């Protein structure tokens, strides 16, 4: 039996003496607010960064090993928040088989194992595809399967299950539970439902660890409520678009190669919730709305005008897209520079104070405003991306999983802000129907590049089983 012992670990001002034992075969859920140090702890354990004080020990049947001599990549696997950073293979098969070949396994056995792994995470038949062609959820499944195949003694999943639809998450959880006997697992998550499946719950707060014991008990503790600021989202109090409103987006018998087929209308001020399983075409639909891809058949009308290459600049002035994993695309030298790029020529004191107040509305403090984006947590970077998108008050806002990686308090504050933009037309992609139920006017369910269901929010429960079968959390 192997035990990983984290002893008095410190890292700058973020982690202030963390202690816990992690047993092989034990599943630990780790929760905490954005920026509390969860991902930093993951990188410390995986050996990607070194602590400023304290140590990590590996004991095998009670015998302590020198941590500096441990082959960490064989003992510890890490699935990060951003699967695009972790894929290196030219194809799905290469990604799944790369580590196994490096361990010296026979090539024929590896080929057979690759087919099994691909099938187990719903990627059967896609072995020859490039990981770049996969959806975010599919790529996350690929990375998880590739690391599980190496059979590490300990596995860290840093928000790795968040972007998966219900069916895909169930597949990955099945693999994780199958591996539990030989693999200790640390699930970093903001999802209480997922945390309840763990054996033990740890919470990071103010640089310290709080051991909450059994998650079924800990998650009803007032400590968690205090940490996350859990409260109900405000009820919708503003009016929505009427049937006679202007047609802002109109796909007329459009096809985008084999990826997407659309014949839909979106009216000014509408909030459309777009749901469906991973790889169903949700992100592709948003790409089409902003002109990243153009139809091979039919046409897209934007405010009544045919979208063509010549009109892309006009469309993109009116439309803002917040990408999935938007925090990965920040390039400003500071948070302030990222959000207000191009507006700083006349950065008067009064205007600067107003801008800092704007950032505060997204949970971005004046201190964070001067930080480089790459120094922020994943959730903090997501908030910066949202602030940058909303700064210019676009007419159409396209949101691709905007709440990924956010703790509950941050999610509530962002949703409150989004819901207040009643003049905006919003297309909101999510795996979790609950994110949009209080705000959406209509729901689109996507499967295989088609909108297979278009229903008003008032009658969504009539179709609840169809949503569930499709893998949508509701």
Feature map (PLM): residue ranges:
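Conserved beta-strand-loop-alpha-helix hinge in the C-terminal portion
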Residues: 208-230, 450-473
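Catalytic Walker B motif of ABC-type/P-loop ATPase nucleotide-binding domains
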Residues: 155-159, 397-401
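Conserved ABC ATPase signature
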Residues: 130-134, 138, 372-376, 380
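Conserved ABC ATPase "signature" region
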Residues: 108-126, 350-367
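ABC ATPase NBD coupling module
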Residues: 63-77, 179, 306-320, 463
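Helix-to-loop junction immediately C-terminal to a conserved catalytic motif
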Residues: 46, 290
């Amino acid at each position: 039996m192997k035990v990983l012992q984290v002893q008095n670990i410190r890292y700058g001002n973020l982690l202030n003496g963390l202690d816990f034992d992690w047993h092989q075969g034990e599943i630990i859920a780790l929760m905490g607010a954005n920026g509390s140090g969860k991902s930093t702890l993951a990188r410390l354990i995986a050996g990607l960064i070194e602590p400023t004080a304290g140590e990590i020990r590996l004991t095998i049947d009670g015998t302590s090993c020198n941590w500096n001599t441990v082959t960490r990549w064989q003992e510890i696997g890490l699935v990060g928040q951003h699967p695009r950073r972790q894929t290196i293979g030219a194809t799905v098969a290469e990604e799944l088989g790369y580590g196994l070949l490096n361990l010296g396994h026979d090539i024929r056995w590896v080929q057979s194992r690759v087919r099994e792994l691909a099938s187990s995470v719903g990627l059967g038949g896609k072995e020859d595809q490039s990981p770049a062609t996969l959806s975010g959820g599919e790529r996350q499944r690929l990375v998880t399967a590739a690391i599980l195949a190496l059979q590490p003694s300990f596995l860290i999943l840093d928000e790795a299950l968040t972007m998966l639809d219900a069916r895909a998450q169930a597949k990955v959880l099945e693999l994780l539970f199958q591996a539990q006997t030989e693999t200790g697992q640390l699930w970093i998550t903001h999802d209480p439902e997922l945390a309840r499946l763990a054996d033990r719950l740890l919470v990071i707060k103010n640089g310290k660890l709080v051991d909450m014991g059994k998650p079924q008990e800990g998650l009803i503790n007032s400590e968690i409520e205090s940490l996350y600021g859990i409260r109900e989202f405000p009820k919708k109090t503003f009016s929505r678009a009427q049937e006679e409103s202007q047609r802002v987006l109109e796909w007329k018998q459009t096809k985008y190669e084999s990826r997407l087929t659309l014949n839909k209308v979106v009216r000014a001020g509408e909030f459309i919730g777009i749901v469906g399983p991973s790889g169903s075409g949700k992100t592709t639909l948003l790409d089409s709305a902003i002109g990243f891809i153009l139809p091979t058949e039919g046409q897209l009308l934007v405010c009544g005008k045919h979208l063509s290459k010549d009109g892309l600049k006009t469309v993109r002035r009116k439309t803002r897209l917040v990408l999935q994993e938007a925090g990965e695309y920040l390039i400003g030298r500071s948070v302030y520079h990222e959000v207000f790029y191009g507006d700083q020529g006349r950065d008067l004191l009064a205007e600067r104070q107003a801008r800092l107040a704007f950032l505060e509305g997204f949970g971005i403090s004046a201190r964070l405003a001067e930080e480089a984006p790459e120094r922020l947590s994943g959730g903090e970077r997501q908030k910066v991306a949202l602030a940058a998108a909303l700064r210019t008050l676009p007419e159409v806002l396209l949101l691709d999983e905007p709440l990924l990686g956010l703790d509950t308090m941050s999610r509530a504050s962002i949703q409150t802000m989004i819901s207040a933009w009643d003049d905006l037309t919003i297309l909101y992609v999510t795996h979790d129907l609950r994110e949009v139920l209080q705000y959406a006017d209509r729901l689109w369910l996507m499967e295989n590049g088609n909108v297979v269901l278009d229903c008003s929010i008032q009658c969504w429960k009539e179709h609840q089983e169809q949503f569930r079968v499709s893998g949508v959390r509701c």
